[in-house]
Amino acid sequence: GQKVRLYDVMQKTVDELNETKTIALHHAVEGVGTIEFATTDIGEAMDGADNIILVLPSIYHESMARKMVPHLRDGQVVLLHPEASCGAIAFRKVMKEMGCTADVVIGAACTLLYSTRIQKNGEVYIFGIKNAVPIAALPATDNARLAAAICDVMHWFVLTDNVLMTSIDNLNAMMHGAPMILNTSRIEADPPQDYLYYHDGITPSIGKFVETMDKERIAIAKALGFHQRTIREEYIDMYSCGDETTP
């Protein structure tokens, strides 16, 4: 029931979206969503917005924060979706550096809610939606405000204690780095090989290697005083998949 606006840096992308003002979803979710407008002007996108959801790789969090901070207004909620690790801390750091005193909530999700790929502008393929994605605010005293703004609108987001937990809950360090390095020969093959990163690239041996790496993440969580599910447990819980289909 909330109006949705989109911000993008590509004028061509924005122009095409504004022609239809729709985004079509396929596979795990079927339907067509309507947007209010798309724009390359971050101030226009943020003006009057209650909830601002930042969906982009973590290497751009700082630069986007610098664009966004001058336009932040009291009462707004920003959710880094996902934050990777320590994204909320980086965002707050930029706010402090730029002298921003706006009373805003900065939240962080440990991972992206959906597994998806764009098919063409305005059309996306949803492979799956996670059953639950933990989120938290920085500072944690804002958790109730974050829950009211985000969890009440999108029930898949569930509140956890703090952004330290969401940062440790980031699985990308295991699932992206190791399989990519161990598939270097496929990636560099000439002629190029067409393979599916997860289904073909994560063999039983690579899966075991990833699980071994994951033990360090679990140990860090334990040392910090909280329980952390293993990467195998997380994937089974998130996608309701059987053990035999989990790397």
Model regions: which residues?
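Conserved N-terminal Rossmann-fold NAD(P) cofactor-binding segment
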Residues: K3-A49
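Small-residue-rich helix-loop
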Residues: I206, T212-P247
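Residues at the C-termini of beta-strands that transition into short coil/loop
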Residues: D8, I42, P82, C110, ...
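Substrate/ligand-engaging "lid" and interaction regions
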Residues: K93, L113-M213
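Generic structural signal for residues in well-ordered beta-strands
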Residues: V4, A38, I106, V158-D161
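Conserved hydrophobic residues forming the short capping helix/wall of the S-adenosyl-L-methionine
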Residues: K21, R92-K96, A221
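Rossmann-like NAD(P)(H) cofactor-binding subdomain of soluble oxidoreductases
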Residues: S58-K120
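Rossmann-like NAD(P)-binding element
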Residues: V29-L79
